Amino acid sequence: MSDFIVFGIRRGGNHAIAQWLIPQIVGGVKYGHAFTLRGTRDNEFIAYGEGENTYIGFEDIRFSEFSENKENWLNGIELNDLKTIMVLRNPWNLIASHVQWKIKRPLYTRKNKVISLWFDYYNEYEAADKDINFIIYDKWFKDINYRKQISEKLGLEFSDEGLQTVVNIGRGSSFDGIEYDGNAQDMDVLSRYKQVDNYSMNTFKESEIGQDLKNKWNHLCDLEEIKELKII
């Protein structure tokens, strides 16, 4: 029996990875991608399904925040053989998804927080904490061998059973909704930043912060040997 805590940034592929991981967890999961702190920090658990294992997904939460508030937020839940996972996505694709989301919902205002969170997650990656298992979403999406490595590292029996699923949580993809449910690999998720051509996205790309994010991502691509996923 193993329990999982997964950290990710909203629109960062967290639900896709959850749908892929959960079928590989022998004995099923107790919470799925179901624990959320919607700004109120009310410690509310929303259970989806039953099982021997616990899978808790945190979105838009810094790892340092969790470390400081762990006992309060977990609210007495006991975790065994804990696997901590952090999901990191190409920042330009991530921002493009948020910009696209804002086009559909003009009152949406989370872009600046997303940028700050990405830098924090990247710093955790650079620190190479052995207790954190990183999943690079873009590499995960395209590379079956990488997915097999992740499963092996987490002690799971590899399966791509959930790979093609697009769930209607967060209304699916910012671009495609749930249109590709059953064929998720057909979505063009690796080139989202090329698909948004408006003032907000173009200004971001040329900004100092945008260029800094690009440089850090490209450095990560060198380390992960995924040069084909560099931002050019």
Regions found by a protein language model. Name each.
Residues N14-H15, D42, N93, S151, ...:
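General helical structural elements
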Residues G27, D131-I132, I226:
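A general structural signal for well-ordered secondary-structure junctions
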Residues M1-I61:
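PAPS-dependent sulfotransferase catalytic core
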Residues I17-A18, A96, L223:
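Enrichment for repetitive, rod-forming helical segments
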Residues I5-F7, I17, L21, I85-V87, ...:
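Generic hydrophobic secondary-structure signal
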Residues I61, F66-Q164, R171-S191:
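PAPS-dependent sulfotransferase catalytic domain
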Residues N14, A18, L88-P91, W118, ...:
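A structural signal for well-ordered alpha-helical scaffolds and beta->alpha junctions
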Residues L156-I232:
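PAPS-dependent sulfotransferases, especially Golgi type II membrane carbohydrate sulfotransferases
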